[in-house]
Amino acid sequence: MNKDDCILFSGGAAGAEQAFGEAAERHGIEEVNFSFAGHNIVRTRGLRVLNHEELASGDVSLEYVGRLMNRRYTADAPTIRRILQTIWYQVNNGQEIYVIGTIQDDGSVRGGTGWGAEFAKICNKPLHVFDQAQDAWFTWNGTSWDRREAGDGPVATHIHITGTGTRLLQPNGRKAIDDLFERSF
């Protein structure tokens, strides 16, 4: 795969998205960060501010997302809604999805990042999660998570990848991102 053809889709937020962007930049990978007016982000390379019509294209029912992820979202949470809409763009544009976070007992991923993982499942896209608490990569097989053995981390095989995850990035999560880019590019 020619890295000049590759694009990382992310959101530019502090934590995992910042680390994905930094790794992409170090490896000469183009970067697109989806955001919205007024959103606090730290990565501005490849910034794509979505307008109200574009955000509406990625709109999802907070009730549906809440049921899917066993969580409650209030309908009057415009910032949460916009964040979920930008995550829709990240996953929709990526052919392969990489997430840094925590897989919960119900199989969902904790936090807003979880919507990205669930949407990737719905879209049947290759999905890999680095669970910081378990210090391991997991790959979604269509029905459950398969734990990857140490030394068998995923390798990007598509030119359009999505990198997202927790704001609370731990050193092992950062290393997982760096190692992913080293293996892939």
Role assignments for model-derived ranges:
Residues 2-185:
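Acidic/glycine-enriched connector segments
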